[in-house]
Amino acid sequence: MKLNLSKMLTLLALTLSLIAVPVWAISKDEAKAKGLIGEQSNGYLGIVTASPNADLKTLVNTINNKRKAAYVKSASKAGVERNVFEARMGQRLQDKTPAGQYIKLPNGKWKKK
């Protein structure tokens, strides 16, 4: 059975659309701008919205895992405990957060900067 070019292209487009789904997921900057996520004082991202979808959870977990690996390495180089380094980075990240985006206060509440 021969597939004509049109059917092959349709099949290819369908396959690529299934593979490319993560490309359409929201970015960190978009999620911050929309008020879905924000910076916490511990150096990690947190989810602001009460009902996050799976893509948002995956985004935050992926970024936080990368941050943790970087913090472990940097804390070791600096000769400090990881939690000390995390707190320093958390403060820097919150300080750099633009107006209109969220930061988590020490009392656990989210505040729009």
Please give the residue ranges for each predicted region:
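Short, well-ordered alpha-helical segments
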Residues: V60-A75
